[in-house]
């Protein structure tokens, strides 16, 4: 057990990761040494940043807490603290069930932890944080919360209403990250296209991204978690015209059947969805779309699912994730709908949908063979350098494996790479001499 060492464990999404990075920086400015997601935690203090989005995430968070409780019982840990979405939503229940945890913090009061550790004079962060990602890319969280209230989603119950950071504050953070050597920026929030509306009633995402793209040193900007309803079409012009805004958009459609979209409270129709996809592809040729779909929602019929399969087949998304519905207490669907799709049917539909997408993804990736792309190198792994094109977000998308026998490549540097082969998961390439 190492004195003055704090082991941080982050569960869930990249938005949680940003919170962990912020508090790690504050810990370090107050004399602590921090590790993140260490396979061999040795600190005298542990902080677990939990996820409470869906049942599987809750279970993973609880199991992690229990692991550290055992370490504490075995004398391998002095203090255990829990923060994040799970403790934001279930603080009272967790305190009653897990008294071994020294204190639970919510999603927004975690900075109180420093005061509780005797560090009352907490320096202001101003977006400066301890990056846990490779030093050439970072996540930038531009807002918290969500005003949409989709029927299945617990996020508004956890994080509250949409709250945008001011434009200048975000831009200052990006400038600071550029000064640290960051080249690539993953722009994240729960509903990116709503950014700024809570500030003055106007969409400001286009202004933000346009101004961000003009900052010297910003090589790539990638946009995550857009919403199809009231999508600001002028954002597409920025994606098309700014060379450092990646031709990539993460936009969750969830379903295509009008019956399902209505029950999900998505406030968008099938035709509006199809029209938006066509407009995106028209305005930004070559754009890669990542989407998320939900199967097994209450009331989903065989006909609804057939529509969804047809949608995936015709839309030919470059990237797609899909999930089966799980009831989340307090949500509209949990209160008003019966979870009436059997679990085996949910799983069968999920498997069938992913099989369709797998074939599409393999075809689209194979079309890249023989073409040259700008690739950033993330790491060396065995006999390959592993990198990504502008069409690939870290952690979730295919990677480019470049043979290390060619020459020594530098992590965080861009190279022109000719794609020589593809498989189910990745691309293979050679640096253009």
Language model: regions and residue ranges:
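Proteins enriched for Cys/Gly/acidic motifs involved in redox and nucleic-acid/cofactor modification
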Residues: 1-195, 234, 249, 271-279, ...
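Conserved SAM/AdoMet-binding glycine-rich loop
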Residues: 78-84, 89, 94, 179-305, ...
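Glycine-centered loop/turn positions within well-structured domains
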Residues: 111, 148, 193, 258-259, ...
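Conserved, mostly hydrophobic/aromatic
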Residues: 170, 187, 223, 251, ...
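Active-site proximal loops enriched in glycine and acidic residues that flank catalytic Cys/His/Asp
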Residues: 189, 225, 253-255, 291-295, ...
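Extended hydrophobic-aromatic, low-complexity segments
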Residues: 247-248, 261-262, 285-288, 303-305, ...
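Terminal RNA-binding accessory module
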Residues: 335-433
